[in-house]
Amino acid sequence: MSKIGSKICKNKNLKWLRDFLAPYTKRAYIVGGCVRDAMLGKKISDFDVEIYGIDPAKFDALMAQIGACGVGKNYFVYKFKNFDLSLPRTENKTGEGHKAFEVAYADDERAASLRRDFTINAMMINIFDGSFLDFYGGERDLKRGILRHIDDEKFAEDSLRVLRAVQFSARLNFRIARDSLRLMKCLSISDLSRERINGELMKLFGAKFQEVGFLYLYKLGLLGKIFGLNLSREEAEKFAVKLKSAVKFLPKQNGKKDEREFLYLLNGYFGVRNFYDLGLPKSFEACVKEPFFSRRPSDGELLKIALDKPLKNWLGLNSPSLIKRAKNLGVYEAKFEPAIDTAEILKQGFKGAAIGAEIRRRQDLAIKERLAKPSV
């Protein structure tokens, strides 16, 4: 039993599954990202389990017995509580699009794992005896921080894997193997739907090392295809430095960084002309309207932004110096709310657009008065 296998086998979540499957097979494996994350020391709460030695009809009957929910059209994966339970399979491309695959049952561990995208996602751990299967060198690549594809032909069958490589590089801070990067440069993502592209972009936007993923988007020529941008190498490298710093220092909201920071900066520095065609969640539209400065904003400009929100909620508050200044101005946690009497403005006879203009004039005056006082 391997060390990591022993640890996984002790997981209490797996006991019921072992007891349930024991009369039928002892060849059930934790697969994919579960093994990868466990080996990276991450806590595993959801399990992908591939079950061998049971024919499809019997497997369907067993899944019906526990009330598992089947998903998929070509080949069922069953969801039950925090488990994805499936039979091993091979996949062969038969046409255009991500659904044009011929799927077949494959009761062979090596053959079934060949369909995986990267070596680090092709490792397997038996839930009964903890044995560790690694046919393609995933453990070695994991230790070296390398994303390496398994098979040229299989990898090229789904161009989404190019974007998966980008988001994995950003989440794990891994480099893409030279041969894999060369293959990816030959693959077009034009067959992908906007929905599938955005699914991977959202993972990139939430990653810790977004600058790594950004540079791979540049190297793969995807900045133009996705965002309509044509950047020089110098521009890309300088932006990556800015992005790395911004993501590091951006205050967390509800325990996590705002996933819109990537696009906020990209649009601010270069102008993403196809922004509204990207099909991203509605919440992203607000980030193009957020104040952006390519230079150091003044205290007056910070107070003006704080009229609308506490600066901890501003996407541009992404450096230690800005955070310190916001706190000194007293607008990090709270808005700047000068005492402006709207009723008095109306009483003075202001109407229509003049009302807003007068409010803004008084706000500007309040900002000047605030700046004339010592910092709090």
Predicted features, each with a name:
Residues M1-V376:
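Catalytic cores of the polymerase beta-like nucleotidyltransferase superfamily
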